[in-house]
Amino acid sequence: MNNIFHGTEDECANEDVLSFQKISLKSPFGKKKNIFRNVQTFFKSKSKHSNVDDDLINKENLAFDKSPLLTNHRSKEIDGPSPNIKQLGHRDELDENENENDDIVLSMHFASQTLQSPTRNSSRRSLTNNRDNDLLSRIKYPGSPQRSSSFSRSRSLSRKPSMNSSSNSSRRVQRQDGKIPRSSRKSSQKFSNITQNTLNFTSASSSPLAPNSVGVKCFESCLAKTQIPYYYDDRNSNDFFPRISPETLKNILQNNMCESFYNSCRIIDCRFEYEYTGGHIINSVNIHSRDELEYEFIHKVLHSDTSNNNTLPTLLIIHCEFSSHRGPSLASHLRNCDRIINQDHYPKLFYPDILILDGGYKAVFDNFPELCYPRQYVGMNSQENLLNCEQEMDKFRRESKRFATKNNSFRKLASPSNPNFFYRDSHQSSTTMASSALSFRFEPPPKLSLNHRRVSSGSSLNSSESTGDENFFPILSKSSMSSNSNLSTSHMLLMDGLDTPSYFSFEDERGNHQQVSGDEEQDGDFTFVGSDREDLPRPARRSLFPSLETEDKK
């Protein structure tokens, strides 16, 4: 026994074979307690195998023998008989020294197989490892039916990915021929729609709004480079625009302080039309609504026929009567619209420098009336323009509640077919229509026309044929008054008040009527005469209830 385990090549072969068995099967042979528990596996009878299984085993054995990682003496020992129990007992004492070398050899063998198929996924690697473990177990235990079944099952599983790979290759061929599956067609359609929408959005957003596409240039602020003295209003926290004094305005207009830094200087008068007509700064423009402001300074710049070749920006000076509310509000709206248009060119703008005239037109008129034409001053709350002031302020308040944002002002500012292009024409037509509507002369409604039964010749009222009596009894009927289209409803209601007796003698307690001669009637006042109160007919009662009147007479 000692000659078998010492100093021969068979000893080394047996040790290597047992190490492969321990690593692949993960059997507890390393623990001495479990040695005799696994001895029964060596005495199991060999199961019957088919010829197909034997051929597969022989092929795998040949492939394993031809591996470059195995030595010649190992291949010889694998073909030998299985070791006995004593050899296993002695092998357990020598396993600890050779575990490291065997692990390295086995890992190199598995690595060589994985390198041959680098495109396999993790599931294929696990199947390959199980296949290698089953291969080693079948080499050691060729008669075990359980191991052969697991080996054949692993081979059947390992063949499925190859079938899938062949089907994938056939699909690739079909795609090259132009036959695309429906799923890929839908995905390609979605991708094309997304790309088309992005292209349309970029083209739509860049074509109307890009200043360079229409020849419009945007500029940066150069107010700090100029010699214009400006300051900010500390009393109003919402005022973000610099302010200038009336003296600075005079120097800009007369001494051309901004000629080297600005292409031109424009003064915007935000007062109402009647204020501007009463007196304004020379060469100023009257704009008192947001629509007019957008049309003059945004639409004309974007959609003008002539290209803008200016290399310098335009300086804007905005004011109202006191430059406290209307002027700063319109200046803020213009800056907001300018920022929306030039959002891709931040911080450049069409009008980077906007100044507020501190004190407004009143301060200029008080200090430098020679700058005004005509040299007059009409206030907003002037007595002769109270109605116009109230109407214009209502419009201005409604406009101030609207905020210009990117969503609600994007197409309004950029569209060339905006109705604000015709703002001035429509405004002028509306003013002419209003003036023509108010040009008629006011005439009061005609006076009441009363029909009388008997009226003297000196009376101005309509009279019927005289019967010779001096006394007369006027007949007041609503039917005669309703026939006249000039009478109003209030006059009709006035007739109801005539039903009550408006004439009686306060001297007589019974209410006898006064008797007046016909000569006294000619003085101009109506005097109703009757000997008895019942003799006077009541027109409303007679017209509404004629039957009651006849009963009363009876």
UniProtKB/Swiss-Prot annotation:
Compositionally biased residues, Low complexity: 119-130, 138-171, 456-466
> What name is this protein filed under?
M-phase inducer phosphatase
Q: What does this protein do?
A: Terminates the cell cycle delay. Reverses the CDC28 phosphorylation catalyzed by SWE1.
* CDD domains (alphabetical): Cdc25
Which protein family is it in?
Belongs to the MPI phosphatase family.
Segments carrying the region annotation (Disordered) are 72-93, 111-192, 449-469, 510-554
Q: What is its EC number?
A: 3.1.3.48
- Report the residue ranges that make up the Rhodanese domain in this protein: 261-373
The protein's annotated catalytic reaction(s) are: O-phospho-L-tyrosyl-[protein] + H2O = L-tyrosyl-[protein] + phosphate
Q: Which GO BP terms apply?
A: cell division; G2/M transition of mitotic cell cycle; positive regulation of G2/M transition of mitotic cell cycle; positive regulation of G2/MI transition of meiotic cell cycle; spindle elongation
Q: Which UniProt keywords apply?
A: Cell cycle, Cell division, Hydrolase, Mitosis, Protein phosphatase
Organism expressing this protein natively = Saccharomyces cerevisiae (strain ATCC 204508 / S288c) (Baker's yeast)
Active site feature: 320
What are the GO cellular component annotations? cytoplasm; nucleus
The record's GO molecular-function terms, alphabetically, read: protein tyrosine phosphatase activity
